[in-house]
Amino acid sequence: MITDLFLRGDRSAVIANIKRAATEGRFNDKVETNDPVLDLSQERALEANYLRMRKKPAFWLNSHLELALIGTTASVDTRHVRVVGRDNLAGVTGGAVVTSNHFSPGENLMVRKAARGRSLQIVGQLTNLEMGGFLGYLMTYGTLPISSDAKYMGREFPKLLGGSLQKGNWVLIYPEQEMWFQYRRPRPPKRGAYYYAARFNVPVVSCFVTMRDTGVHLTGDFNRIEYTLHILKTLRPDPKLSVRDNSLAMMQADYAQKCELYETTYGEAIDAPFSAADIVGWHARG
């Protein structure tokens, strides 16, 4: 699996950052050690270039090619990933916001397996557009980029997201924001995903990936892992509530059902102290 590729190399510094942040209750902190950082002028240059690209006919062609390539990759790569709860998708016929836990650069392929036959775009950091090679190609044409630029986020991003949802696409937004490598617990979500679902009046397709350490060595630091993607109860905006109240209600309901699944699967309270087992497959070093 592609996710196995990311289990190689020394992740001890990242895991130490996760432990520190979890122990201190900072569940949305950035923990990766080598993420690129852009200043505002660099962000605006990337935004402008991306928006120019979207207006060209080649962008439409490449977007459809990216969808075909990533769909084929997901089908092959996730053939051993179990998906449960498809019955919870009954009645989801158009655009939707998808939420899931963010623990690996490759876990979105599992969400694509759940989407099966639906176009899925991913909301990701603007820095992804600077990647080169095949991965950079996928990021450019399969991602809706977000930025710290308030003007872009207030004007351009809602247009991009709303347009995608209106076309019937699913859009994956990570409410946990930052990736915590191989971390198994659901983390308290931020409101953005649910705000956009309420604003554009689309359902929230709630996903959560559970992981099982097989005990079979894969790398020097990690065992091979089995993954199960759970599709939980779909959440829908209440027409009697405001956008703000809807977003808060769906955020709380989504986190609650993810926590319930976690506690049922792992037999541990969501607020138990951090342990090495929280980083699934990792061989803790003394």
Q: Locations of the language-model features?
A:
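Short amphipathic alpha-helical segments and helix-helix/interface helices
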Residues: I70-G71, V111-R112, L135, L161, ...
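A generic secondary-structure micro-motif detector
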Residues: F59-N62, V123-G124, A150-K151, Q182-R184
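Non-catalytic C-terminal accessory region of glycerolipid acyltransferases
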Residues: M1-L38, P158-G286
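A conditional alpha-helix N-cap/helix-loop micro-motif detector
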Residues: R79, S104, A150-R155, P186-R187
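Structural motif corresponding to alpha-helix initiation and N-cap regions
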Residues: V83-R86, M131, R155-P158
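Catalytic core of membrane glycerolipid acyltransferases/transacylases, capturing the structured
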Residues: V92-K151
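Short, basic, glycine/proline-bearing loop/turn elements
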Residues: G71-T72, T140-S148, E176-M179
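Membrane-anchoring hydrophobic helices of lipid-metabolizing enzymes
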Residues: M1-V97, G106-M110, L135, T140-Y141, ...
